[in-house]
Design a protein with these regions (language model features):
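Conserved N-terminal beta1-alpha1 strand-loop-helix module at the mouth
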Residues: 1-96, 108-138, 165-172, 176-186, ...
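Feature marks short, surface-exposed loop/turn motifs that line or immediately flank catalytic pockets
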Residues: 44, 146-149
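Acidic/glycine-enriched connector segments
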Residues: 100, 105, 126-129, 146
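Non-cysteine beta-strand/loop elements that form the S-adenosyl-L-methionine
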Residues: 137-146
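Gly/Ser/Thr-rich beta-alpha loop segments that engage phosphate groups in nucleotides
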Residues: 145, 192-193, 209
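Glycine/threonine-rich flexible loop motifs
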Residues: 150-152, 163
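Serine residues within intrinsically disordered or low-complexity segments
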Residues: 156-159, 225-226
Length: 227
């Protein structure tokens, strides 16, 4: 089972310095626990600050063997500048394609990048899977499977700790996404817990992606991964 953690320093207490320090400490715990991937998703940071944090995370992760792979959310420029292991692409317009990112990595004499892609519908999954080989992502993050924090109220939402939680796509949709994505591995995202992770694997997922799960239980990250 692949395990893919996503950062969110806003969940830590203290000032900016304290939060970045806590994030690095979390990364060290995750690496020691055997996480496979860590996505740096701190899009409010300036380019310089994001690159600085990426370099510190890379040093932290690469102190472990095997070292988890670090992916930078959306910012291929930062990934290249820091020699990160890859890039995570969202559905936002204007981003580079997987093929373009691979070309840039090759031009910089860097190893083949890991490229993950967010998909929220079966159509998005099908488009990714039917792309030319060089344009396919390494992994697809499909979700939200169980739930997602949203800003607006909706009949399918409940309030938890003053936040709105929307019902996810469910396991049947995840199963369909895994079939549509073949041969691209799919990681389940959205409301993943220790209690429901096994059900996503039974539905065909190759692993799980999460923020809260790995923040709350960094040293108990479910079954052993397959590096």
């Amino acid at each position: 089972m692949l395990r893919y953690a996503i950062t969110d320093r806003a969940r830590f207490k203290g000032d900016e310095i304290a939060r970045r320090s806590a994030l690095l400490a979390q990364a060290a715990r995750l690496a020691a626990a055997g996480i496979d991937f860590l996505q740096l998703r701190e899009n409010d940071l300036s380019t310089a600050d994001l690159a600085s944090l990426a370099r510190k995370l890379l040093a932290t992760l690469r102190a472990h063997t095997p070292a988890p792979r670090l992916l930078i959310n959306s910012r291929a420029d930062v990934a290249l500048a820091t020699c990160a292991d890859g890039v995570h692409l969202t559905s936002a317009p204007g981003q580079l394609t997987p093929g373009q990112i691979r070309t840039l990595y090759a031009a910089a004499s860097l190893p083949e990048p890991v490229i993950s892609l967010s998909c929220h519908t079966l159509d998005e999954v099908a488009r990714a899977a039917s792309s030319a080989q060089d344009e396919r992502p390494t992994h697809i993050l499909f979700g939200p499977v169980f739930e997602k924090v949203v800003a607006e109220s909706h009949p399918s939402q409940k309030s938890i700790a003053n936040k709105k939680i929307a019902t996810g796509a469910g396991l049947d949709m995840l199963r369909a996404a895994c079939l549509a994505a073949e041969p691209i591995p799919v990681l389940a995202l959205g409301g993943i817990t220790r209690g429901n992770a096994a059900s996503t694997l039974a539905a065909g997922a190759a692993g799980i992606a999460a923020i809260r799960l790995f923040l709350s239980e960094p040293t108990h990250i479910l079954p052993q991964s397959s590096h």
